[in-house]
Amino acid sequence: MKKNLISIDVFLTETRYQPNPTAIFNQICKKKSETLLLESAEINKKHHLESMMIIDAALKISFLNQIVIVEALTKNGVNLLSVFKSLLPKNVIILSDNNPLEIKFPILSMYLDEDQRLRSLSVFDAIRFLIKSVKNLSEFAPKSMFFGGLFSYDLITSFENLPILNTHQHCPDFCFYLSETLLILDHKNKTSIVQVTSFTNDNFEKKRLKDRLEILKNKLSKNLCPIKFDTLKNMKLWCNKTDEEYNKIIVNVKKFILQGEIFQVVPSRKFYLSCVNPLSSYEVLKKNNPSPYMFFMQDRKFTLFGASPESALKYDINSRQIEIYPIAGTRPRGRRSDGSLDLDLDNRIELEMRTNNKELAEHLMLVDLARNDLAKICEPGTRHVADLIRVDRYSHVMHLVSRVIGKLRFDLDFLHAYQACMNMGTLTGAPKVRAMELISEIEGEKRGSYGGAIGYFTGLGMLDTCIVIRSAYVENKIATIQAGAGIVLDSVPQLESDESKNKAKAVIQAIANSHSCQIEYL
């Protein structure tokens, strides 16, 4: 029986502005799981723009091994879980009726055309049913129902006929936290607001939420403690593929290109090293390599942090504009032997990259792939390239970038858009499905978070995500840093191997520096 939909309440308070979100996270969240910090910075000036922190989550929704798990984390979330369960259609199987609720959606038929598959019942409808459980979202601020978390690369196997691979890690196919307590820092205007969302009519629970607001206001009024930096004697770095092995993969991939099966593919490799204190490593990474998207996700079984230069998918519900930001073409920054920046050398490297036929061909191919992805979901005549072949600079590398936008069809939402576009072409290649098949064969294991997307969406339908690159996935105090290179016909194997190392370098160095140790290469 369907239950009455929820009327939410939102409580807000302004708190003392403090400019270091990582220090706030360290003081307020500490090692608490189901917490998340999302930050943004200007691409060129590197000024910090906004930080959003899920301090308390009411509910967690995740998907792994074809099972959706919805867990209420507070009494506030229990009420929402009850209404959500009543909205499920009969063809959704309830495997466990308790908290956490475990459900299974029908397997998507691979014989439907693209549009039919977009409209078919899928695991994304679990998120839609959660949002539909609330009836008065439009009365409140846009972030009153705020979900933050991860779509993994391997989520694609639920929508395309791709191999199911093994993994030793515990990364779900998607994992999102529904915020109960959200901190929003506006670094431009130097404001700090704590938002608490109530999903219940229980007066005792509402009082607890209001009390929580006051407790946090008091905590945030005090000076912050510095982040603890652990020291390790030495740090061993090892890789699952040597340069020689990776070069052989590139040579083999080029055979498929010559045969006409693909135009490009993006094989990756994994670097491993100890990471005792991920938060301190994240602090060093964002200081040395400020990026448009920076993130620190703390789950029970893993921690994920990074500083990504590349948007995955961005959607504005008000203008209905959908955006992809392809990055393809990479060079190291022009630095002297002592590590200082040589501006003349940096400019010459940029000029070489901008005029390199191989890099331009690869980049334009991926711009075209982004155009094709958006064509599936946009109103006719609205898709276009807003920016073509600009250069973005970061601490260790520079990139060729473009921006492709369009207006989402009125019969689709942000989840349809993500389903149609995943995974981003800059992490797969083209044609996309065949490239992903080859990646499965080459790599032989799940990618997990790498190449997926992390960010947030709201109950009103806003979406902002970045591609999970320049990141570390930490489990059992071991960090996995994954990086790849786009292989085309003109690729030189050793140069592509070097590129994959350059992409991983900023994160590896941040982990080493935060633990005050030298890296021993194995």
From Swiss-Prot:
GO BP = L-tryptophan biosynthetic process
Q: Which reaction does it catalyse?
A: chorismate + L-glutamine = anthranilate + pyruvate + L-glutamate + H(+)
Q: Would the keyword Lyase turn up in this protein's UniProt record? A: yes
Gene3D superfamilies in UniProt: Anthranilate synthase (3.60.120.10)
Question: What metabolic or biological pathway is this protein involved in?
Answer: Amino-acid biosynthesis; L-tryptophan biosynthesis; L-tryptophan from chorismate: step 1/5
Q: What is its EC number?
A: 4.1.3.27
Cofactor(s) annotated in UniProt: Mg(2+)
What are this entry's molecular-function GO terms? anthranilate synthase activity; metal ion binding
- Quote the cofactor binding remark: Binds 1 Mg(2+) ion per subunit.
User: Which residues bind chorismate per the record?
Assistant: 329-330, 450, 470, 484-486
Class in the EC hierarchy, top level = lyase
Binding-site residues, Mg(2+): 362, 499
* Domain of life where this protein originates: Bacteria
Regulation of its activity: Feedback inhibited by tryptophan.
InterPro entries cross-referenced by the UniProt entry: ADC_synthase (IPR005801), Anth_synth_I-like (IPR019999), Anth_synth_I_N (IPR006805), Anth_synth_I_TrpE (IPR005257), Chorismate_C (IPR015890)
Homology family:
Belongs to the anthranilate synthase component I family.
Summarize subunit and interaction data from the UniProt record for this chain.
Heterotetramer consisting of two non-identical subunits: a beta subunit (TrpG) and a large alpha subunit (TrpE).
Q: What does this protein do?
A: Part of a heterotetrameric complex that catalyzes the two-step biosynthesis of anthranilate, an intermediate in the biosynthesis of L-tryptophan. In the first step, the glutamine-binding beta subunit (TrpG) of anthranilate synthase (AS) provides the glutamine amidotransferase activity which generates ammonia as a substrate that, along with chorismate, is used in the second step, catalyzed by the large alpha subunit of AS (TrpE) to produce anthranilate. In the absence of TrpG, TrpE can synthesize anthranilate directly from chorismate and high concentrations of ammonia.
Per its record, how is this protein called by name? Anthranilate synthase component 1
- Source species, please? Buchnera aphidicola subsp. Baizongia pistaciae (strain Bp)
